[in-house]
Amino acid sequence: MASPCLIAFLVFLCAIVSCCSDNPIDSCWRGDSNWGQNRMKLADCAVGFGSSTMGGKGGDFYTVTSADDNPVNPTPGTLRYGATREKTLWIIFSQNMNIKLKMPLYVAGHKTIDGRGADVHLGNGGPCLFMRKVSHVILHGLHIHGCNTSVLGDVLVSESIGVVPVHAQDGDAITMRNVTNAWIDHNSLSDCSDGLIDVTLGSTGITISNNHFFNHHKVMLLGHDDTYDDDKSMKVTVAFNQFGPNAGQRMPRARYGLVHVANNNYDPWNIYAIGGSSNPTILSEGNSFTAPNENYKKEVTKRIGCESTSACANWVWRSTRDAFSNGAYFVSSGKIEETNIYNSNEAFKVENGNAAPQLTKNAGVVA
């Protein structure tokens, strides 16, 4: 007969495995084998600053049946047609698709683009996704890769705005400008001309979770530039993501604002993992950092635009319950005034950093 101590240990071990096997977002919907019959439940599962994002919940379903693209006059059944409608829509796909957009795809507010149940690829050498002055957008279950620059040209922005000339774009996978309430979850992003995700120009209420970022140098930019004060109100949650392999820097790189980086798993980076300028507040909690082998790359953090260490001494960059391997280390600074950054609807449980590899094991598109 097993000893009471052994039994107690096994019960304790099972409790640890059970609590850490799935993160709270995945536990909310993936445990239901019939999730396809209740797709909109996903909108109840976000955590962090983007937890109020409803996307297309409560609207009609719109099914993408064609990979064709007409930037000015999209036809029904195409992704651009659904994404530019004024009405609330939950967009799904009838089959596996490889979509090469001819111009950036402007996503109107109150939309969910839900790739679950199909193998959906965007980019493929064309421009990708763009959001401006919209709210309540969910992007889930998409492979976004090979996004390229675009030229000046006419694009249908939305039904109400109509067709307008759009400046050339840099080749980001996902661009958000002055966006509120957006949730980017369970996507696989790689190999684009510029960044994978840009959150700028007063965007706030954003959660970026369960994504896989790989084979890309400049991953995630939060904040427009060092002179854009409106980004001081920016609040972004970066949680349960897998960074790497072959992710170079900006995971994320923040200007101004408040960024909570929680339970992410970091493979060795090329330049740095987390960076910033213009006094952002960066709270790193329960992440797992594995440093590169080169001794001069061991530091997780990079403060940009500081003439000296003392110039950044008051920036609030804190590491709590992070796990470090292969010599990785986080340089903390500043004093945080308030530890309760979330309201009751936004808050979620953050595990210790040693659990991050398990919590991110399903990051990216889920089959």
UniProtKB/Swiss-Prot annotation:
Disulfide bonds: C28-C45, C128-C147, C306-C312
Keyword Membrane: no
EC number of this enzyme: 4.2.2.2
The record's free-text note on cofactor binding: Binds 1 Ca(2+) ion.
Single biological process term from Gene Ontology: pectin catabolic process
Cofactor (UniProt): Ca(2+)
Leader peptide range in chain numbering: 1-21
EC class: lyase
Keywords for this protein: Allergen, Calcium, Disulfide bond, Glycoprotein, Lyase, Metal-binding, Signal
Function in brief: Has pectate lyase activity.
Protein family (similarity comment): Belongs to the polysaccharide lyase 1 family. Amb a subfamily.
Name listed for the protein in its UniProt record: Pectate lyase 1
